[in-house]
Design a protein with these regions (language model features):
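Conserved Nudix-box catalytic region and its N-terminal flanking loop in Nudix hydrolases
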Residues: 18-57
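Conserved hydrophobic "DFG−1" position in protein kinase catalytic cores
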Residues: 11-12, 21, 90, 105
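Short secondary-structure junctions
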Residues: 58-65
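Conserved S-adenosyl-L-methionine
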Residues: 67-71
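Active-site-adjacent beta-strand/loop module that shapes the phosphate/pyrophosphate-binding cleft
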Residues: 62, 72-94, 104
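Conserved N-terminal beta-strand and adjoining loop/helix that marks the start
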Residues: 1-19, 40
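Generic C-terminal helix-cap and adjacent flexible tail
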Residues: 128-133
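NUDIX/MutT-family hydrolases
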Residues: 87, 96-127
């Protein structure tokens, strides 16, 4: 099974106390779960370019500062994914669910209260451990 390359953004607010998350549409894979916004890396596209494009499309922000937070591969029964989780610490505009999906700022310490897909859980735990005060 071919691995699908995905970029996902950990979008921090200015003082790194909150992260912007979005809810997956009910009709999509892992529908109804919360997630770090992002999407597929297109052929001939760098991870950085994909992150900029996906966040403009999904949450309406222009990324100005990003760095790799974690690389992870995960196999679901029906698909294999290769993730690059990107820390986004500077951007222009206010994020919102541009494609009609629900989006919100969440205190980092409250992230475990939200249901995320299994592949996101190790990243979620690391974010909470490193950034909750």
């Amino acid at each position: 099974m071919k691995r699908i390359h995905i970029v996902a953004a950990i979008i921090f607010n200015q003082d790194k106390s909150q992260i912007f998350i979005t809810k997956r549409p009910d009709d999509k894979h892992k529908g109804g779960f919360w997630e770090f916004p992002g999407g597929k890396v297109e052929p001939e596209e760098s991870v950085e370019q994909a992150m900029i494009r996906e966040l403009e499309e999904e949450v309406g922000i222009k990324v100005t500062e990003q760095s790799l937070f974690e690389h992870l591969e995960y196999d679901y029964p029906d698909k294999s994914l290769k993730f690059d989780f990107i820390s986004v610490t500077a951007f222009e505009h206010k994020p919102y669910g541009k494609e009609g999906q629900e989006g919100r700022w969440v205190d980092i310490k409250c992230l475990p209260e939200y249901a995320f897909p299994e592949a996101n859980v190790p990243i979620l735990e690391r974010v909470v451990q490193e950034f909750s005060s």
